[in-house]
Design a protein with these regions (language model features):
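Conserved ABC transporter NBD signature motif
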Residues: 77-88
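A short, surface-exposed alpha-helical micro-motif characterized by mixed small hydrophobic
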Residues: 215-217
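Conserved ABC ATPase signature
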Residues: 149-153, 157
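Q-loop/switch helix immediately C-terminal to the Walker
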Residues: 108, 114-127
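H-loop/switch region of ABC-family ATPase nucleotide-binding domains
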Residues: 209-210
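ABC ATPase NBD coupling module
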Residues: 88-103, 239-242
């Protein structure tokens, strides 16, 4: 696999090898069985790069994010190897890093607390309002947005608020799970450009999306998922060269 990154390091920030995820289920006769939804999945993210994970709905993209962060439901079983900066990504390490070094930007703005003003949400426990003002300014959010509730934000503003939470935490790994639903083409591209900026600042970005055309605009590498596994991982430019540059 190509070691493409913007920080000049040969070590991946995130490494996922041979990941398998299954869920315990019960049939109509109450017999327990395991439903495997991800198998033999591989992906790496280096500092300073955007890796776009593309695939149709049901291909396992969001489950990859939840596996890395350790937020799968209790009936899930995870096998394989996951590492963060060379350390095995154990449950204990996931809890330590989640929301700090590793941040999820969810697909739905409903993750914002509807009863709390957004400035306070972005500030979190360790931040300051001065830093909130600075981050909001970076993403073109008006000062009055601090005092707004989520329902008062436009779709584009809400997306920028979610991105602001990652910047406030100075996260090293940002996992963006379908961050552009419901946005027009221009607003979607603007939203994704913020992830490109974060990668250029040294973050590793795992961008989960179904829109490969948008991914081309910012990604260093594309990982194609199909049927719960990785079928292709290559530089974004290889897709434009034609099928002779691809394995599949």
């Amino acid at each position: 696999m190509m070691k493409k990154n913007g920080a000049g390091t040969d070590s991946p920030l995130l490494s996922v090898k041979n990941l398998t995820v299954s869920f315990s289920r019960y049939d109509h006769g109450f017999n327990k069985y395991d439903l495997e939804v991800i198998h033999s999945l591989d992906v790496e993210v280096y500092p300073g790069e955007v890796v776009a994970v593309v695939g149709a709905s049901g291909s396992g993209k969001s489950l990859l994010a939840h596996s890395v962060l350790g937020i799968l439901p209790e009936n899930a079983t995870v096998k394989g190897e996951m590492a963060y900066m060379g350390q095995p990504l154990t449950c204990e390490l996931q809890r330590k890093l989640r929301g700090r070094d590793m941040v999820l930007i969810p697909k739905s703005v409903e993750f914002l607390d509807t009863l709390m003003k957004v400035g306070r949400q972005v500030k979190g426990v360790r931040g300051t309002m001065e830093k909130v003002k600075s981050v909001f300014g970076r993403y073109g959010l008006p000062e009055e947005a601090e005092k707004m509730y989520p329902f008062q934000l436009s779709g584009g503003m809400a997306r920028r608020v979610l991105i602001s939470t990652a910047v406030m935490e100075a996260a090293k790994l940002i996992i963006a799970d379908e961050p552009t639903p419901g946005l027009g083409a221009d607003m979607a591209m603007e939203t994704l450009s913020h992830f490109r900026e974060l990668a250029d600042d040294g973050c590793g970005v795992l961008l989960i999306t179904h829109d490969i055309d948008l991914a081309f605009g910012i990604a260093d590498r594309i990982a194609v998922f199909y049927g719960g596994t990785t079928v292709e991982v290559c530089p974004a430019g290889d897709f434009k060269k034609g099928k002779e540059a691809l394995r599949h």
